[in-house]
Amino acid sequence: MTTKTRFAPSPTGFLHVGGARTALYSWLQARANNGEFVLRIEDTDIERSTQAACDAILEGMNWLGLTWDEGPYYQTKRFDRYNEIIAQMLEQGTAYKCYCSRERIDALREAQAANGEAQKYDGCCRDLPARDTDEPFVVRFKNPIGGSVVFDDHVRGRIEFSNDALDDLIIARTDGVPTYNFCVVVDDWDMGITCVVRGEDHINNTPRQINILKALGAPIPEYAHVSMILGDDGAKLSKRHGAVSVMQYRDDGYLPEALLNYLVRLGWSHGDQEVFSLEEMKQLFKLDDINKAPSAFNTEKLVWLNQHYIKTLDPEYVASHLQWHMDDQKIDTSNGPALSAVVTALAERAKTLKELAASSRYFYEDFAEFDAEQAKKHLRGVALEPLQLVQQKLAALTEWTVEAIHQAIEATATELEVGMGKVGMPLRVAVTGAGQSPGLDITLFLIGKVRSEQRISKAIEFVADRINS
């Protein structure tokens, strides 16, 4: 049997990291077993579902690279199918119409609560004969009486629920709209889902869904209920712990590879290995290796992974993601070095692409002023001669190469009988406006000869004015 999994988010908000991890685990289960992955949008909550949220989910999945083989399917486009099955169940007697009023249901729950009993429907309409009436009704599933529902969860082992603890679930509301638990069952059946990976908050839904599947004569999929993600303080992950939207991590400068690597390790492991490519994940992933204990989100580890991928991935690929941040920070890259070359130069220093973009501005744009602190420290009177001499040597170069630039700077220090720092630091401030950059030779090479000479002239003028003031 072909493995077939699904990710089925509700479009009531963005794709958060918990949902992204569930999607990743489900995607990996399919890919590790040469199976298929389905994307399904569970939008039956019509009042809360929005197109914007749906678009955000698709954007997040695409950014992460979690491609789907089928879908996206939308539950709101399948109402005819759900109603067809409900009609069959009413005909077969596995479902019934319940005419109990809201007042009666509320009174029943209050009485059960007062008596310390579990709150559940009492089956008042379960065996009533059919009525020819215009009274409003819901449709309930006729849950089995007695016995239990047992399933082996890939993460939590054997789980058992007594049928007596389950009430007759509403599968269609008074307005005729089918309910979540029912739609899920029909979808999983129709789509041939063989393994359901989802959060632990769905465990209580599982016995209800299994009973409906049995009533329909449908196969029962395997289940894996993954634990929640906590903040570093042990509380449920929320906005106060930082970004929770997948696309917010994009905006903050993280690569999808870093986030995927981090998310897969939030509950799953393979020995002591920390860094996993997507291909390695597909080869090694097993649902049975997921830990059932909650995982704590640690931003420092994510930053470390992001640095690793910025440094080790193909610079052209990193540049393709960096371009978004250059555009976001309004840095025009059309007049300057190849962005991949800038990635190579700055990768060792950057924690995020957002930082990398900000620190690369001087490669593409002239700056209005020097950093005040660095200028005070390095653009002093003693810097005038080194700047003038290095400008002459750089201007004389017939080939603008990293090696030639390095030799020109070195020759300046040798001729003036000073350390490289006496030449290098004023020169760095002159061409970048700041006190930090990659090696001066590669920095000047990427800035370009004309622009470098112009900036050195500006620094010489700045120092001369300072001497004369």
Swiss-Prot record:
ATP binds at residue 239. A motif ('KMSKS' region) lies at residues 236-240. It comes from the Bacteria. GO terms for biological process: glutamyl-tRNA aminoacylation. It is an enzyme of class 6 (ligase). It is found in: Cytoplasm. GO terms for cellular component: cytosol. Gene3D superfamilies: 1.10.10.350, HUPs. Zn(2+) binds at residues 98, 100, 125, 127. A motif ('HIGH' region) lies at residues 9-19. Its EC number is 6.1.1.17. The keyword Metal-binding applies. It catalyses: tRNA(Glu) + L-glutamate + ATP = L-glutamyl-tRNA(Glu) + AMP + diphosphate. Its cofactor is Zn(2+). Belongs to the class-I aminoacyl-tRNA synthetase family. Glutamate--tRNA ligase type 1 subfamily. HAMAP family: Glu_tRNA_synth_type1. PANTHER family: GLUTAMATE--TRNA LIGASE, GLUTAMATE--TRNA LIGASE, MITOCHONDRIAL-RELATED. Catalyzes the attachment of glutamate to tRNA(Glu) in a two-step reaction: glutamate is first activated by ATP to form Glu-AMP and then transferred to the acceptor end of tRNA(Glu). This is Glutamate--tRNA ligase. It comes from Shewanella sp. (strain MR-4). The lineage of its organism: Bacteria, Pseudomonadati, Pseudomonadota, Gammaproteobacteria, Alteromonadales. The gene is gltX.
